Amino acid sequence: MNILITNDDGIASSGIKALEAVLQKEHDTFLIAPLRERSATSMALSIYDSMRVERINDNHYIVDGYPADCVNIGLHGDIFPRIDLVLSGINRGVNMGHDIHYSGTVGAARHGAVHSRLSLAVSSGNITKDYDYIREAEFVRYFIDEYSSLLKVGVVYNMNIPFDFVSSMENLRITRLGKRTYEDTYSKKNIIGGIADFYLGGSKLEHATEEGTDFTAFFSGKISLTPLSLDQTDISLVQELSDTLSKSLS
């Protein structure tokens, strides 16, 4: 299988190195990643500016752009053979609930899904400095080898692995997205007249406890796998709104 590996933590991150080290034993891997940290960039693309792309060798490229840029170049830049699977991660920190809308890790995988590739985003709850993520990568390899035939194109599979996890399929749960709330705080500096620099000082994160969600699985020590559709239409509201508007116009 031809696997494109990318992330939003940057080319030097331990997570992406672990995936490549483990997967290249049995697959053809092609690594293309951002030059630097690009967290919370979702599916951003560099549309109006050029990007500097550095070729290390035939299988390794560095992009001074966003994670989705990396996927786009990897798929359409005539640098790799046809890619079968877009794999994004291993992210240093989880991406659950509403996080997925901000995440560059998930955004990169979603870009692969938009272009009809199998797409998997992987995040870890282990943010220990200098951690190597090899155990997580080994689980990802096993999952891909044994279950990739069950995956569908046009879907993003979002995997979150707890800090202390049992590496077995019996420990994996198929989940839905939970609900995350954010309480953001900003600081202002360099105030001159009506101009100031705003800095996001941090976010207080909370989540709802509901059965069947990624949060519930994760915090009970299970690996969560959430299938994410590209179609974000709220089907339940389509007919309801249509009927309501029709009545208001009649």
UniProtKB/Swiss-Prot annotation:
Pfam families: SurE. One of its GO terms (cellular component) is cytoplasm. Its cofactor is a divalent metal cation. One of its GO terms (molecular function) is exopolyphosphatase activity. Binds 1 divalent metal cation per subunit. Signal peptide: none annotated. This is 5'-nucleotidase SurE. Keywords: Cytoplasm, Hydrolase, Metal-binding, Nucleotide-binding. A divalent metal cation binds at D8, D9, S39, N91. Its EC number is 3.1.3.5. NCBIfam families: surE (TIGR00087). The gene is surE. Nucleotidase that shows phosphatase activity on nucleoside 5'-monophosphates. It is found in: Cytoplasm.
